[in-house]
């Protein structure tokens, strides 16, 4: 059995167990067990099948068993565990992945070395380095210190791999993990790294005890460890959400954590950051496909606007050139930059496109380095951040909340490619005497305490980069491949189901265009807030965005009952009726909207459209002419006036308006319709000329209006 067949069977069984189809799950599990040819697994499966048959038999006989549900849940959980273990052992025999490759290597070359022993080795090396650093600067041996740092980094890397591949774990492994992570035995940066190894281990196969260890990390004294632990735990809980209700110990642990004053707020904030991570791909695409190409096109034009003598004499003249800003405004670059700046202020990941090309350094070939908290004294950065101003630069980049840890390493490693003389010159700008640097030290950027939100946001960005950019990323379960919706994790419902949380998360989804997710929350809110018209408006809008006009109309009508004279609601109701091909009903609501805003051009146009749909062209013309009167230069009503005039036989009037259209910005359909008018007036040659132009424009214009003609 090859790896893909094993994985498919594994996830088929997961699906059956999620639906609680135990008998079918046992049948597929038997295929895996038979392939493994392991008598212990065979006996375990037989035992589960026997218990299941007895339970069914007792139920059919009408025997009341108060323990039936707990027995059933235990069977489901046991089936999950057996599936995990059997599929893991089978994959270990044939899979070429990095995970199983390391397990085979460790088994062959490091037999008998437990996690506990690896922790002891690392502890001793850290103590050796601490002793070496206690010596005065004159007595310190730089090469020895660098050698010790290298050894610690290598040992930490091996330990990371050991924790990642530690499945199935023994009781001693759980004790070692707890002692290492939560007894102040190791530095916080070291513990922070190892938490990511636990996350990767759990994404490979579920382990209840390790999930509880992650949740216990929230009680650590370090905010960095607290937030990293919680991020990891929430990702794991979402991935394995179907089996969590079976774990009583998990529910008890969550109940205890709910007593922590910040736990609920932290969970909610991390959830919002997971939602933000879904924007990263969209932002990257906008940067690469819209902003950067526009700036490249604009570059030569901007250079021409800058007089060479101004450039040479006074660089500040650039800031004073109004034509420069005007060009940026007209090109739309200013708006795009403002949008990206606003997203960055909200914590969105706007640097993914910038740093994705800087992940090919050898540093990132080691899996553990993707999760390292930034350390400017890492041996990979040796000599890069030295010289005058280097210490200040280290402080600045370490404290910066704008870059995640992975991007900070990318930035510093890219500096190593800069010639030393230029790098020293740049570092010199960050000397302590520099007034700008002194000012920055006073600002929040240089504060030692970084907000909890920043910690989790940066860590999520680190995780996102690993799962999207690591060279062997396809071997991992990518939690960011879909949307991490914690509302679908039933054990977290007590934390997220209050009205404030539902409204906050719903508005967050709504603003970002995730209408299906927003709809789910607004409908839950509507059950509690029957008299809130805004909720029904947003429910209707979400349905409308999905193209479900019947349900949208139902929601808008409820909003109308609560706020009968709301202009926005009335217009939406009319729009729904129009899309449902009910122009009579739409017309009645557009007339109501007209009474509220008699000079609203959009309303007047839509009234005209409704009359056209009813084939009342004369009445439609009245409203189109009103629009043309209120906005004579806009030209919004020219096309409907021209076409309706033609339909009612006012050919000369239609001709005049088509001439205005063709003098403005005509599309293929305009020439096509103008040709009809000229043909009806007997101007055959002119009609043929218009038809030819229509065809030419149809195949040369990117306009959707033109393409629709074909």
Predicted regions and their residues:
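Conserved small/polar residues in nucleotide/adenosyl-binding loops
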Residues: 699-706
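Alpha-solenoid helical-repeat scaffolds
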Residues: 383-563
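Conserved structural position within tetratricopeptide repeats
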Residues: 526-527, 557-561, 591-595, 625-629, ...
